[in-house]
From Swiss-Prot:
It is a multi-pass membrane protein. Residues 1-50 form a transit peptide. Pfam families: AA_permease_2 (PF13520), AA_permease_C (PF13906). This is Cationic amino acid transporter 6, chloroplastic. Expressed in roots, stems, flowers, and leaves. It is found in: Plastid, Chloroplast membrane. Permease involved in the transport of the cationic neutral or acidic amino acids. Keywords: Amino-acid transport, Chloroplast, Membrane, Plastid, Transit peptide, Transmembrane, Transmembrane helix, Transport.
Length: 583
């Protein structure tokens, strides 16, 4: 039985009193059956759901703004570390091929985001895409995990800014931080610089999206200039012999010292350097011409970043033999050990500092817009959905998440934070690719979704089997046979689906090519990368996933049910997925 009471505005509320709320909890099963897999429609997301925010975001961004935001979001300080680590441990000089492969895969995954963003130009990004496809709870589960990943990552990035700033000025990090006795290790180093950076960026993104884009453009231009400078210095000082000859003759030699396995292991490691383009899709509501600007902005930024990464990889591989590369600070260490070139180390620190600021700005823009649209769905308080009438930005969401990020950055050690990021982002990429296939092959209305759902499940299982074989089975002929067999099965599954199940709809404006192969590659890649993450990542994912489920059970499902009863959601729309499953 649904238990509701009137709120002050004449609507229904499950939270008007403790008694009403406790009675509402008894209706949780029936509300779950109605709301958990209820889908919204594109027209509702563009009209009634957007209206929850009151004011509208201004459409002021063009394709070049999106390219700048995409580059700024992807090219952070991490590339200065990831390149050396992947080259030293996995790929050797062939790290440039690893970056090219990872860039191609990132582009395929970005295509999935682009089709949704063109069709549904709202600020919700992946949350909105999954909500119109799989329903409310899957959208909240993935979106909330992504927001937590954003917050953790931004806190980690802001603390690393202190370290790179110290490198640029030749000052030890300990001079910028102070230790508080009595606090547990990992939480006792206070970093006021990180807090200041987060709060300043929070103020910037609250003031104006257009001005934020201009600030990002300026900092990104400086960052790219520093990167090109380091690349040129690497080519000048480097030696092409290092592309094939290790320092130790006993180590594997050649351009591919670790073979194909090393190239793909390297690609898996450096793929995380491309994370950031998804934040561009959250800006869709503020783009002047989404049909034209979003495909150019997203694809263009990924392509440019791929070229930059490949040039950096070649430059670094020429600087030193791969077995002498410092996996923690490859460029800085290479120049620091050369007479007369130590000053380049400070240039690297300055460039990395700009990269941190741009990636932090873009990520904080993205996390606020995710939170804003989650608030529009009412599964979190719709206070987060409010748009400021003067700035046309989600000030409430930006301020709340900015303060939360600053609090984490103040106390929490970088290594603690880094163990908590990445899995949510990869999981969202995986869900968006699945959602795109489902949306293309399952029409809205009474129909049978099971062939598509079975295909997605079988392909995911096969991809997981391939990943486990790659990670766990020792090298040898049995491993090669098992990998080949699982690959053949995966290809056969896709071919069978393509032949048996016709596309139910084709996009009118912009669509992903080579369906369903393109999103399938994205699904496989994200499962493969999820399999490469360490145990603490899954502990974090399980912990926060449990919290998210509890929030939905004790708040979200009741708040969205109230919104439906008050007319914020269409009853017909809320029944679409339920009707699909009942067929």
């Amino acid at each position: 039985m649904e238990v509701q009471s009137s709120s002050n505005n004449g609507g229904h509320s499950s939270f008007s009193s403790l008694r009403v709320y406790l009675n509402s909890l008894s209706a949780t099963p029936s509300r779950l059956s109605r709301r958990a897999i209820s889908v919204s429609t594109s027209s509702d997301e563009m009209s009634r759901v957007r209206a929850v925010s009151g004011e509208q975001m201004r459409r002021t961004l063009r394709w070049y703004d999106l390219i700048g935001l995409g580059i700024g979001g992807m090219v952070g300080a991490g590339v200065f570390v990831t390149t050396g680590r992947a080259s030293r441990l996995d790929a050797g000089p062939s790290i440039v091929v690893s970056y090219a492969i990872a860039g191609l895969c990132a582009l395929l995954s970005a295509f999935c985001y682009t089709e949704f963003a063109v069709h549904l130009p709202v600020a919700g990004g992946a949350f909105s895409y999954i909500r119109i496809t799989f329903g409310e709870f899957p959208a909240f589960f993935t979106g909330a995990n992504l927001v937590m990943d954003y917050v953790m990552s931004n806190a980690a990035v802001s603390r690393s800014f202190t370290a790179y700033l110290g490198t640029a000025f030749g000052i030890s990090t300990s001079k910028w931080r102070f230790v508080v006795s009595g606090l547990p290790k990992g939480f006792n180093e206070i970093d006021p610089v990180a807090v200041l950076v987060v709060l300043v960026i929070t103020v910037i993104i609250c003031c104006s999206t257009r001005e934020s884009s201009k600030v990002n453009m300026i900092m990104t231009a400086f960052h790219i200039a520093f990167i090109f400078f380091v690349i040129v210095m690497g080519f000048i000082k480097g030696d092409s012999k290092n592309l094939s000859s290790p320092a130790n003759p006993e180590h594997p030699s050649g351009f591919f010292p670790f073979g194909a396995a090393g190239v793909f292991n390297g690609a898996a490691m450096v793929y995380l350097s491309y994370i950031g383009y998804d934040a561009v899709s959250t800006m869709a509501e503020e783009v002047e011409n989404p049909v034209k600007d979003i495909p150019v902005g997203v694809s263009g930024s990924v392509a440019i970043v791929t070229v930059l990464y490949c040039l950096m990889a070649v430059s670094m591989s020429m600087l030193l033999p791969y077995d002498l590369i410092d996996p923690e600070a490859p460029f800085s260490a290479a120049f620091r050990g050369s007479n007369g070139w130590e000053w380049v180390t400070k240039v690297v620190g300055i460039g990395a500092s700009f990269g941190i600021l741009t990636s932090l700005l873009v990520a904080m823009l993205g996390q606020a817009r995710y939170m804003c649209v989650i608030g529009r769905s009412r599964v979190v308080p719709f206070w987060f959905a409010k748009i400021h009438p003067k700035t046309s930005t989600p000030v409430n969401a930006s301020t709340f998440l900015g303060i939360f990020t600053a609090a984490l950055a103040l106390f929490t050690d970088l290594n603690v934070l880094l163990n908590l990021v990445s899995i949510g982002t990869l999981f969202v990429f995986y869900m968006v690719a699945n959602a795109l296939i489902f949306r293309r092959y399952v029409p809205v209305g009474p129909t049978k979704p099971w062939p598509t759902l079975c295909f997605l499940t079988l392909f995911s299982i096969t991809s997981l089997v391939f990943t486990l074989i790659w990670k766990l089975v020792p090298e040898g002929k049995p491993k090669a046979f098992m990998l080949g067999a699982s690959a053949v099965v995966a290809i056969a599954i896709v071919l069978s689906f393509q032949c048996v199940v016709p596309q139910a709809r084709k996009p009118e404006l912009w669509g992903v090519p080579f369906m369903p192969w393109t999103p399938c590659v994205s699904i496989f890649l994200n499962i493969f990368l999820l399999g490469s993450l360490d145990a603490p990542s899954y502990v974090r994912f399980g912990f926060f996933s449990g919290l998210i489920v509890l929030v939905y059970l004790f708040y979200g499902v009741h708040a969205s049910s109230d919104a439906e009863a008050n007319g914020s959601f269409g009853v017909k729309d809320g029944q679409v997925m339920k009707e699909l499953i009942e067929v």
